[in-house]
Amino acid sequence: MIALTEDKRMLGYGVMTPYSNIFCFATTRRGGFSKGDYASFNCTPYTGDDAESVRSNQELLCNSMPQQPKELVIPFQTHGTKVEVIDEKYLNATSDERTAMLQGVDALITKEPGCCICISTADCIPILLYDRKNQVVAAAHAGWRGTVNYIAGHTLDRMRALY
């Protein structure tokens, strides 16, 4: 992995550098605003972290990207295999509808330019997929339950069915 920020809060995947139309990265716990158990660069709103710290971290994240995303999409993961597509239906949904759509989701797929799909991992595995032909990206959170229950396969199947 290569450092994308001076403080190493964002790391890039060297293997993805040939694909300049997408931006793949991982974040670390460094360089943010959160305190205590969530110190310091926690970007997920589904923890006990201070909401203002999370918003500040998300803003810092977006400002660290080469191009400001239109949308930062973070699901409420449950170590399952639910896959959600971030498309016009999602983008046109109300805030409450979006929250409901992201409940129990461990993989996201999108073809929408400017959408930054996110997953959270600690000791789990991030799976990042890219369909160059159709310009579709996916990110899946693979814990042991998701791995045993084929989250990678479910995500690929959904991508194939839609695109």
Stretches with model-predicted labels:
Residues 1-163:
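Active-site microenvironment for binding and transforming phosphate-containing groups
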